[in-house]
Amino acid sequence: MTDYKKNLGIKESTAIVISRIIGSGIFRTPAPIMALVGCTSLFGLVWVLGGIITIFGAVVYAELTAMIPKSGGPYVFLKEAYGPYIAFLRGWAMFFVSETASIVAVSLVFTEFINAIFQIISGEPFGIFPTFILSLFTIWLLTGINLFGVSLSGKFQVVFGATKVIAVGAIIGITLTGFSTGDTGHFTDPFWPKDFGWHTVLAIGAALRYSFFAFSGWEGATYMAEEVKNPGK
């Protein structure tokens, strides 16, 4: 059995979770959520509901990790509860579908924002080939950092996590500044929809899918529970 080095403290573990949650989703999903609900009050409601539901899942994972402090996350939990077959299916689904798609999404959104900056400077966007190369390079770079070990990658996560928190804080600050000055011209129904019916409820439900994607990543620390100094925390 492999003995893992416990190189991750509470700071690094928290940074890993923050970096996974504040990924591509939080920067990419607000626009489609706003397009679905159409007003700021329901926009905020979607994020609050998504956050509450996410907290329920995170608390369950925290309890399971404290009870079963083993690396592997959902694979380990399913193996303990339902046996190796179900856990095997979940593990391969994560490898071939969910985690792989998540990595691709993060790299593409990163490239999309770099492309936007490049277009502002040069006046022309990237082509398909440069987009592919930059996305691939991003994946290779982050993979290379992780190959140097948990200790180094944990330190990078602290830096990346702090940078993302600052970026999100800046976006929130700019938004609140715009509303405080009465600049709501970008919204057709700034605070409440003109009519509220089943179509509004369905729109909120559809928008929740995007918020769940944006909040995904809270299970990140469970994958490396045996490399955390005190996983019970």
Regions found by a protein language model. Name each.
Residues I18-I21, G25, I52, I114, ...:
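Hydrophobic/aromatic residues within the transmembrane alpha-helices of Major Facilitator Superfamily
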Residues P32-L36, W47, T54-I139, T143-L147, ...:
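Hydrophobic transmembrane alpha-helices that form the core helical bundles
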Residues M1-A31, A35-T40, T54-A62, S71:
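Membrane-interface "cap" regions at the ends of multi-pass membrane proteins
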Residues N7-V17, G83-V97, L134-T138, G197-S211:
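Select transmembrane alpha-helical segments in multipass membrane proteins
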Residues T14-I21, W47-V48, I52, W92, ...:
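Residue-level signature of the transmembrane alpha-helical core
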Residues E12, S41-L42, I86, L152, ...:
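Residue-level recognition of membrane-helix boundary sites in multi-pass small-molecule transporters
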Residues G9, G23, L64, G83, ...:
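Hydrophobic/aromatic residues within transmembrane alpha-helices of membrane transport systems
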Residues D3-Y4, T40, G44, S122-P130, ...:
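Helix-loop-helix junctions that connect adjacent transmembrane segments
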